Amino acid sequence: MDLDTITSISTPMGEGAIGIVRLSGPQAVEIADKLYKGKHLLNDVPSHTINYGHIIDPESKEVVEEVMVSVLRAPKTFTREDIIEINCHGGILTINRVLELTMTYGARMAEPGEFTKRAFLNGRIDLSQAEAVMDFIRSKTDRASKVAMNQIEGRLSDLIKKQRQSILEILAQVEVNIDYPEYDDVEDATTEFLLEQSKEIKQEINRLLDTGAQGKIMREGLSTVIVGKPNVGKSSMLNNLIQDNKAIVTEVAGTTRDVLEEYVNVRSVPLRLVDTAGIRETEDIVEKIGVERSRKALSQADLILFVLNNNEALTQEDYTLYEVVKNEDVIVIVNKMDLEQNIDINEVKDMIGDTPLIQTSMLKQEGIDELEIQIRDLFFGGEVQNQDMTYVSNSRHISLLKQARQTIQDAIDAAESGVPMDMVQIDLTRTWEILGEIIGETASDELIDQLFSQFCLGK
């Protein structure tokens, strides 16, 4: 594919030890050679080497920066094009000057995600792998990054390609039946083959969809909201789970005036922990904003940790709060077990019914293990499955797999009902196309542009 040469800063903007300007395209080495004082990059430098030198402004002859230049020649690069990476000091001013020089001498500013888009367009990766690159960058837990890396390595792609190949084999057999309708035994054999293979494809699609709920949690984290009256120990619970001091812990009710959020691994389950301001009536303007944000967080939660105070009897406020959350996935926690017990546990059990109940002391770090195990068991039914298995974690992929399951079922129903093979062929072809959208082989240009526009600059 004949494309122009693009350039961008590939490291976060701001002060740092290193900043990188990346170029990709047919003129990448030539443009860098015009700016670089050192070895002759075009002729004297082999591929996949790092070279010390300086960036010079060709017009003023001024030394702009002391650099290390990586030369990566096509096709063994991320984009399958020539790539230059100019490693500069991390100051904003200097790295921008180097970027401007690359554009002055022939490169174009890259669009968001354009380097990865070129890797896709040049056949280096497919669309699902490209999406996994961004998932990997955005991953907040070890497990999320592992799921993304498995997808980058092509595990999902291989499974999708295998099913598409099976559909092509069915379609080839259907074509034989259409071309030679006079042979009854051919039609019978075709129907039998079609049903057997189609049911296997549907079974594989179902297996992938079965991983969707867990995969989405791995990718995005389980949105977990800690809720309860002010000063029941919500912030202490957040700090114990993340083993950090993120929230202010005091004896003053209403100290948390905003929604605090943190990512953490709990028994291999990635949680997006949200500590809310206590939900109560208040005249304090700042606290009132926090309460409203808490209500919004509750409405979006996957899991709610409802905290009660062992040192206080249940109040109407506790009952009111539980009414708000009782129809969600809830774990009730009676905290501050190190203090005198003034709460009636039997009354708590009457209020919550079969909802899981854990007793803890965040001060003495007691009951935390039981809480973590309960969280894991509630969503994963025990041990989390092997992280090396292939998960479907992307909402777009899940939606397409559901569509493919329906169209392959339509083909099965049609074949079993004796519908003419050329009609069955339509459903099979549609299934093949839908699966192709996952890996980008049948995706529209508009979809591809939209997906890559979500990437960051320089990637």
UniProtKB/Swiss-Prot annotation:
It is an enzyme of class 3 (hydrolase). Homodimer. Heterotetramer of two MnmE and two MnmG subunits. It comes from Staphylococcus aureus (strain Mu3 / ATCC 700698). Its EC number is 3.6.-.-. The keyword GTP-binding applies. This is tRNA modification GTPase MnmE. Binds 1 potassium ion per subunit. Belongs to the TRAFAC class TrmE-Era-EngA-EngB-Septin-like GTPase superfamily. TrmE GTPase family.
